[in-house]
Amino acid sequence: MGGCVGTHHDSSGSLNENSDGTGVALGRNQPLKKDKPKWKSDYPMTDGQLRSKRDEFWDTAPAFEGRKEIWDALKAAAHAFESNDHELAQAIIDGASITLPHGALTECYDELGNRYQLPVYCLAPPINMIEEKSDSETLDIPEPPPNSGHECQLRLRLSTGKDLRLMVRSADTVYHMKRRLHAAEGVEPASQRWFFSGRPLTDKMRLEELKIPKDFVVQVIVSQPIPNPTPVEN
């Protein structure tokens, strides 16, 4: 998770102090380096799971300390960086007056001295990526027998800010619970990414196998369609 701590620094940035007087070595501002971080996930990750992990970070990071406009700039810079558009990434960083002591987006400071940290998974995919399941595989998930398992309520927290209790059955797969959520809230299954305790839940997992304690919350990241830009009138 990204973090933010209050500091004060000038353009030289050699040493600055937090409010408690503790020195923080920032180093001079450096241009963004082109080298992408190489990292390995704790588990083999699909492209969809990586997107969900990133969505979760960008949805929650601005809720902590730091300025939203800086988080927005960092998100845009991270996207440009991963797309190998280093000139655009550097222009975004410069335009937002963001300082990079080590030339990397993993540690940044705004002009007020606030610190921002981007996780490596927002900057590059892991070396152990695996292929996404095809739609045909999802369609192959068998329907559970009618009335199989026991009925229960599952607490969900949507990234839209809504909390709800969904009636499910213990024999349901994650995919079938997504369909239940679609019936209740109109959210397409393909737009849902489910997480429990930070772990992504794949479509074929069954609720009874997940052993989710009663009243624990399952996070659902809802992918929002990108709105069409509003035309600017002359």
Swiss-Prot record:
Residues 152-227 form the Ubiquitin-like domain. Transmembrane segments: none annotated. Residues 1-47 are annotated as: Disordered. It holds the Pfam family ubiquitin. Residues 32-41 have a biased composition (Basic and acidic residues). It comes from the Eukaryota. Residues 12-21 have a biased composition (Polar residues). May be involved in the regulation of cellular senescence through a positive feedback loop with TP53. This is Ubiquitin domain-containing protein 1. The lineage of its organism: Eukaryota, Metazoa, Chordata, Craniata, Vertebrata. The gene is ubtd1.
